Design a protein with these regions (language model features):
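N-terminal glycine-rich phosphate-binding loop for ADP-containing cofactors
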Residues: 1-283
């Protein structure tokens, strides 16, 4: 790369994926000064932008509030992948926040590369898919400007931001996001190695999965578990099962399955296997 990367260059961000996390990230980026293009799949019926628009409206109604002032929603423009993906050429940073499936993310990145301008920062909010796999097959410029930027839900309130370089990520990109996360986004940036589930989810998902198995073994109720694993032991009032609802049970299962398949020799690999009752809820 020949052009230095400076924080003032982040004026417009494309958020690809308007689910719970994508919409909340879009809100946080808007309230920290960026214009945001929020894209998702087009609707099969009715207005094509309705999936992104509906998700953003739902996010604005959620608690805790994703914006400290609703006036910042004016900085967010909704669109769809069919009509508006070419507009990522106008953006300084592209962040992918779609479903936790490697094949679907790779398909989207293939489409993104057709429109992304060289030198544009591109990241993934993946919860645990290896960054090296996500960027496989992409151009050298793409890989040099690509890394993981893993926010935690709700992104306005949780300070942790994991920065995960890929094998070819330029050091200046890493340094930029470490600084930008703290000085602009108000995060505590943590540099992670590209290991399965990185740091927080490797520990957190293990703890939740181990508890899932204990619940099954002891026949505990959801209410009892959340009463015991919340403020009573110094944890947030969302405790365990309510935290899973916030994070998304499907996301948790994807991360756990990823660790199980990528770490077969881990001494506690059995803990990452999904109990039947959890899989039933996802199905």
């Amino acid at each position: 790369m020949s052009t230095p990367i400076k924080s003032h260059q982040i004026r417009r961000v494309a958020v690809l994926g308007s689910g719970v996390m994508g919409s909340a990230i879009a809100c946080h980026l808007a309230q920290t000064g960026s214009e945001v293009l929020l894209l998702d799949l087009p609707s099969k019926e009715g207005p094509k932008n309705s999936p992104a628009e509906g998700a953003l409206k739902a996010s604005l109604k959620s608690k805790p509030a994703p914006l400290y002032s609703k006036r910042f929603v004016q900085r967010i423009e909704c669109g769809n992948f069919d009509d508006d993906l070419s507009r990522i050429a106008e953006c300084d940073w592209i962040i992918e926040v779609i479903v936790e499936r490697l094949d679907i993310k790779q398909q989207l990145f293939e489409r993104v590369e057709k429109y992304r301008k060289p030198g544009t920062l591109i990241t993934s909010n993946t919860s645990g898919i290896p960054i090296s796999q996500l960027s496989e097959g992409r151009s050298e410029d793409f890989q040099e400007h690509f890394c993981g930027t893993h926010f935690f839900n709700p992104p306005r309130y949780l300070q942790l931001l994991e920065i995960i370089p890929g094998p070819k990520t330029d050091q200046r990109v890493i340094d930029f996001f470490m600084g930008y996360g703290e000085s602009v986004l108000g995060k505590q940036s943590v540099l992670c190695k590209d290991t399965p589930a990185f740091i927080a989810n490797r520990v957190g998902v293990f703890a939740i999965q181990a508890l899932f198995h204990t619940v099954e073994d002891m026949g505990l109720s959801i209410e009892k578990v959340d009463k015991l694993t919340g403020p009573a032991m110094g944890r947030p009032k969302s405790a365990t099962f309510r935290t899973c609802d916030v994070v998304g049970l499907d996301t948790l299962v994807h991360v756990a399955n990823g660790v199980a398949s990528n770490c077969p020799n881990d001494e506690r690999s059995e803990s990452f296997k999904i109990p039947g009752y959890v899989q039933h809820l996802v199905d």
